[in-house]
Amino acid sequence: MWINGGYFYFTVIHGQVKTHMNQSLLVTKRDGTTERINLDKLHRVLDWAAEGLNNVSISQVELRSHIQFYDGIKTSDIHETIIKAAADLISREAPDYQYLAARLAIFHLRKKAYGQFEPPALYDHVVKMVGLGKYDTHLLEDYTEEEFEQMNGFIDHWRDMNFSYAAVKQLEGKYLVQNRVTGEIYESAQFLYILVAACLFSGYPRETRLSYVKRFYDAVSTFKISLPTPIMSGVRTPTRQFSSCVLIECGDSLDSINATSSAIVKYVSQRAGIGINAGRIRALGSPIRGGEAFHTGCIPFYKHFQTAVKSCSQGGVRGGAATLFYPMWHLEVESLLVLKNNRGVEGNRVRHMDYGVQINKLMYTRLLKGQDITLFSPSDVPGLYDAFFADQDEFERLYTQYENDDSIRKQRVKAVDLFSLMMQERASTGRIYIQNVDHCNTHSPFDPAIAPVRQSNLCLEIALPTKPLYDVNDENGEIALCTLSAFNLGAIKSLSELEELAVLAVRALDALLDYQDYPIPAAKRGAMGRRTLGIGVINFAYWLAKNGKRYSDGSANNLTHQTFEAIQYYLMKASNELAKEQGACPWFNETTYAKGILPIDTYKKDLDAIVNEPLHLDWEALRESIKTHGLRNSTLSALMPSETSSQISNATNGIEPPRGPTSVA
């Protein structure tokens, strides 16, 4: 049979179809020369890639790929063809094709990066990459050639073969250092992991740092610790901004609005997702300068923020994205709730951001009692906006006072109508979120009287104090940053392993705060003062499954309690030990931890009705140590979504149940 310029014939041996093609085809090598196709060489590569895998057929991959070969085909195209052929065979019945495709892709990736399968020595690689401007020069300034040789001995390049195909595609697309214009890739995954470790611990004493580098490298390269996109794609490069979450609060002035917009552009361009608190902006028709002009309302300024968010990609790694927050009692709320839907016109829609509606107990109470919610412009009701977050009793007092003041502009809406509109938009767009601001302040580690939480981040897992910027260089404002990572519960055998992993994660991320740059002074002020971290989990679904538990029947409740008690305890213990060594964070006194209040004290006690698991760890000793020595970090845990970074570990994302078998082909 003649296909694509070559003769093929087929035989059946033991029920399997074998494909044979003549070897008259010419192939074009990477250096531009041509030679006859060597099918035996291809077969050897496939044989190597299939080693140890179950239920994979090399002949099936050969059959699917050979029929796509043509005279003059490039060797790189041959490799991509067999990778695609293997990936197309991934199924529930034969899942190991994902590893066959991944190994072939790793082989191809290394040939592109190094011109050969075997990676170079680490020191030689770093010297070359620093010379090209791809790696930060500090690597060669901070470490000697002998130390690089030691680190080279830590590397196990065979760990590349543990990636799934989906993971390799994520590495190629997002995480490996590359020229994002030409697509040229400069490294493979084990260099990524060892150099992230080297960068983060570069400031540690010379006599101990290589021990931390090795331990951290082993933890991340065996998928026990999962790193977020900004760290994986950025640490080791000259662009030093690795916080995943940036929370920016806007005031009610043009200077503040413009400063907020400038801060958004700075951080979006450096890999960060954005949370914007725009709740202070006054409503449409409000007087400006005593009535000299009237206000154009929130929507034009939301459009301004949207333009800033979309003006840059996140360092070329992902598109700019933001969630914008406003209170449910804002006078314009009925116009704001519909901003994302597909009805309306361009002038009254701002569709390319997500939205967080801020609610407290009073709003729910009005709903349950069938009462009205009164809407105000924040500029017309002094003290109400701040009390909404800091003091719920004071908020209710002011709210009812302003409701009864006929001189204040207001609008009454049936609570059921307002909640119905919100839930309708939430259901139809999937991107309207809810922030219960009273709970964020009563269950946070911050004292709301000193450091209230007034917003969240892009994905709503972070709750940190902020202060409005009135100028992009305003050092009195506060931009909140959160630096993330996660424990892969599927990769650990027992909860006791979390103690060492917590030490590594806390120390690495805390060191990162000193290692990274801060394009806005208000961000550096907040990061250095609070030293906030957010360490969560991935593969929770697998953790439950391998322990024989389910989401749906309550069987997982006690295991979940044990798991997250261990996580919280070991994280706090690690931060406490670090505080003994390097000092507590400067603004530790603004946390409830300074008063000896711990998460075991503030959780909602109704949980005791459904979970009867006791506490297993020595919290009282930890409490006393924290009161004495403090914590290095104001926050330590966060349940981030980890939508793409979890794919590197071939894990389910965050705490979410799997929605179905998935693959990338």
What spans do the regions from the language model cover?
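Extended catalytic cores of very large enzyme megasubunits
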Residues: 17-665
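Aromatic (phenylalanine/tyrosine) cluster motif
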Residues: 7-10
